[in-house]
Amino acid sequence: MTNATTLTDLTIAEARDAMAKGAFTPLELTNAHLARMEAGRGLNAFITETPDLARMQAERSGERLRAGKAGPMEGIPIGIKDLFCTEGVRTTAGSKILDGFVPPYESTVSANLAKAGAVMLGKTNLDEFAMGSSNKTSASGPVINPWTRTDDDEQLVPGGSSGGSAAAVAGRLAMAATGTDTGGSIRQPAAFCGLVGLKPTYGRCSRWGVVAFASSLDQAGPMTRTVRDAAIMLKAMAGHDPMDGTSAPVEVPNFEAVLSGDIRGLRVGLPRQYRPEGLDPEIAALWDRGAEMLKDAGATLVEVDLPHTKYALATYYIVAPAEASSNLARYDGVRYGLRVPGETLDEMYCKTRAAGFGEEVRRRVLIGTYALSAGYYDAYYLKAQKVRALIAQDFKTAFETVDVLLTPTTPSAAFGLNETIDDPITMYLNDVFTVPTSLAGLPGLSVPVGLSSRGLPLGLQLVGRYFDEETVLNAGLALERASAFTQKPAFLTGALEGQI
């Protein structure tokens, strides 16, 4: 089992068990992925590669394995989304305004993963400041989805904002990667790239050291190729952190240990409002098929109402930009990052922010500033927060009669790199099924279930109660087993090899 291609196809669980038996070393596993990264640079999945650091960490992992002191992710090569501060390794958040910024400290999540033995291959690409659904707003250029349609060779988006993480894992450049999810930024790219993506309950993973977008929504989570791997990685990432005032002081269970796939008696809710007029027939059929899979596995299907769902997108696109406008006020060119000289301090601020922020970030900062302005605060931001509370109450009511919800993850399969680029509203609609879960702070899991008629992966989303990731993951395992999704992107079958 030392063939490089074979090594990069392994799951975290398979690699962990094989290394424990001495089948190969962490360094061999890391070198296989570094070679894959070099071959796959055309995907633009990484902003910064750290091969020397990765090899050093892999060697130390080997020493711990030999000493019988292996961590739960010992020797597993992963990507870290370039929104997580990494001590001594530049962090850009996909923006020009953080040019040259090298953090003097480590984010809690990446530190937890390092303590668990994970090996960092590099920092993955993302939409600028995690604002986007396509990974086209990155100052480092767009990420290419490893998947292609069966009827054309147009390059596709991987989704966003965690598109680099998604492309890296789908393309076997990394075994797993961290993502962040504000309104769907883990789940949507996971669906577009045929991966498992988990947004944990808000407060499950620390936000300390994660560059902020919308502080009441941002949540770190794992992006993997299997549900079991997501469970393993979440255990390593999670935990109360006194450095983060929103980190929940709750016990972190062994998510992998409770995975059985037995969902007999599980009550699965199907929200009526998630089947709007004009829903893509393929998405509707996939949802129906997924529901039948869970029913065949012993679950009971129950229709539920989430009446305020129709207001979720409008609410999100007031709350998130408002928080972003406040968070991004700190980028002024004074203490770190890009600085464009000006004759006055105000001119320096203006020139720096104009040159440093991309179009989408500027758009959201302006929207947020407007929503928070004295004359409009009550009409927009305050009203949005009230509607957000109603959306959360809808979920609470639904969970009185069901254990999990099953919905589509996205309204379509991955779209072309040059599609919808000039239409921000159409782009925002990509989050229509994921945003309500984020507003409520609930855990949401996207699982690949099938392919579209054009050969692209499609995912379904499972939503659970607060801090009940165990039930969500177990239902996800049942769905994963029933769907038996094993297809690989064209990048792995040779169709793109000549382009990379």
UniProtKB/Swiss-Prot annotation:
Its EC number is 6.3.5.7. One of its GO terms (biological process) is translation. InterPro entries: Amidase, Amidase_CS, Amidase_dom, AS_sf, GatA. One of its GO terms (cellular component) is glutamyl-tRNA(Gln) amidotransferase complex. The active site is at K81 (charge relay system), S161 (charge relay system), S185 (acyl-ester intermediate). GO terms for molecular function: ATP binding; glutaminyl-tRNA synthase (glutamine-hydrolyzing) activity. It catalyses: L-glutamyl-tRNA(Gln) + L-glutamine + ATP + H2O = L-glutaminyl-tRNA(Gln) + L-glutamate + ADP + phosphate + H(+). It is an enzyme of class 6 (ligase). Disulfide bonds: none annotated. Keywords: ATP-binding, Ligase, Nucleotide-binding, Protein biosynthesis. Pfam families: Amidase (PF01425). PANTHER family: GLUTAMYL-TRNA(GLN) AMIDOTRANSFERASE SUBUNIT A (PTHR11895:SF151), TRANSAMIDASE (PTHR11895). Belongs to the amidase family. GatA subfamily. Allows the formation of correctly charged Gln-tRNA(Gln) through the transamidation of misacylated Glu-tRNA(Gln) in organisms which lack glutaminyl-tRNA synthetase. The reaction takes place in the presence of glutamine and ATP through an activated gamma-phospho-Glu-tRNA(Gln). NCBIfam families: gatA. Heterotrimer of A, B and C subunits. This is Glutamyl-tRNA(Gln) amidotransferase subunit A. It comes from Rhodospirillum rubrum (strain ATCC 11170 / ATH 1.1.1 / DSM 467 / LMG 4362 / NCIMB 8255 / S1). The lineage of its organism: Bacteria, Pseudomonadati, Pseudomonadota, Alphaproteobacteria, Rhodospirillales.
